Regions:
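Conserved Class I S-adenosyl-L-methionine-dependent methyltransferase catalytic core
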Residues: 8-16, 22-54, 63, 69-187
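Alpha-helical subdomain
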Residues: 1-80, 183, 190-364
Length: 364
């Protein structure tokens, strides 16, 4: 198994003393409470208050407009969680380094909202999802076979957090990705799974000569047209509606494709489905076409916390999204690329929030 240098140091030998290991075990056992306490400390602005000044329990209660009892419960729990510190001489609380990250780190805030609004209730059904290979927790949000079919109908907060999560991770890599994809000045680009058209808009803005075709579900294309309407370059963006879960549905072949782009797309499918999709991509490629696959591959992360986040996100796919996909290890994705009759030309690592781009060509 390939692991980046930092992950190899963390995951191949024991690193915790016994007492620290025991504490982590208890942290896991109380995980739901730890999460909700910390979420409320953020939502009610308490950590932000303690970032700016030391406060007593009574002062926190007054500023947050909660009871002294509620403030005491939250602050004592947060003290043992590790998000606040206490000054013994004055009985005043202040924020810790961990608390600071909860307030100020954009990735942490996005992850917290996503887990509460999209995942939390559904995770009660994770056991069924793992045993049955279906998104058993999705019923907490709506009655669809996959979350993608229901994106336009999700409850407001869930939809907001879902798109914020998706856009945060992809958008942070777009600037570097554009330089890679447009190095050979493509004129035609197929964006498979283009969602709301954010990447397509960046492409037509980046190069005035490129034409983009977004391939996605018809309901997603309707959202895309709303998002791109009247935007600069929108006249060079077209949609192709299809459901790629149906293996009889081919990718568009009405023009020669210089580039095929799949960003955070293949992680939405099982291994068998990925091979099928890649074979259909290969069918519309020639020797000059390049397929760019952008994914957050957990094994290639520079920093260990990113790998932790990604392997946990895999269970969102299991329980909420579709029941059979995950955040893939690069070894697995490379193997599937080969099974589809394609070969890896180059891999670019450490883009944005930990993305990699796999540049793929047809086997000769």
């Amino acid at each position: 198994m390939y692991l980046s240098e930092s992950l190899e140091k963390k995951y191949t030998k024991e690193t915790l003393p016994a007492r620290d290991a025991q504490r982590l075990a208890e942290f896991i056992a109380f995980g739901p409470i730890v999460f909700q306490v910390s979420r409320l400390m953020v939502k009610w602005g308490i950590l932000e208050m303690l970032r700016d000044e030391e406060l007593t329990i009574e002062e926190v209660a007054r500023k947050a407009d909660i009871s002294v009892y509620a403030a005491k419960c939250l602050l004592e729990a947060s003290l043992t969680i590790g998000t606040v510190l206490i000054n013994k001489a004055t009985d005043r609380f202040t924020i810790s380094k961990t608390g600071w990250f909860l307030v100020n780190d954009p990735a942490t805030r996005v992850n917290m909202d996503f887990n509460h609004d999209v995942n939390y209730l559904g995770m009660f059904d994770l056991e069924d999802a793992l045993k049955e290979g279906r998104p058993a927790g999705l019923k907490r949000l709506g009655n669809w076979a996959t979350v993608y079919e229901g994106l336009s109908q999700l409850p407001e907060e869930a939809q907001k957090s879902w798109f914020a999560f998706d856009h945060f991770y992809s958008d942070s890599s777009f600037e570097e990705a554009l330089k890679i994809v447009f190095a050979d000045k493509p004129k035609t680009l197929m964006d498979v799974g283009g969602n709301t058209g954010r990447w397509a808009l960046r492409c037509v803005d980046y190069d005035p000569n490129v034409n983009v075709t977004i391939v996605d579900l018809p309901q997603q294309l309707a959202m895309m047209r709303q998002q791109t309407e009247a935007k600069t370059g929108a006249d060079r963006i077209e949609g192709f509606g299809t459901n790629l879960l149906d293996e009889t549905n081919a990718l568009p072949n009405h023009r020669h494709w210089d580039v095929i782009w799949m960003s955070q797309f293949l992680d939405c499918f099982s291994e068998t489905q990925i091979v099928s999709i890649l074979k259909r991509a290969a069918a519309v490629m020639d020797n000059d076409t390049r397929l760019y696959i952008m994914e957050t591959l957990w094994d290639r992360q520079r920093f260990e916390p990113a790998a932790f986040c990604l392997t946990q996100i895999s269970l969102y796919f299991t329980d909420i999204a579709n029941g059979n996909s995950k955040m893939y290890h690069s070894d697995d994705l490379i193997r599937l690329i080969g099974q589809a009759g394609l070969s890896v030309d180059e891999i670019y690592d450490h883009l944005g929030q930990g993305h990699s781009i796999i540049k793929v060509k047809k086997m000769k």
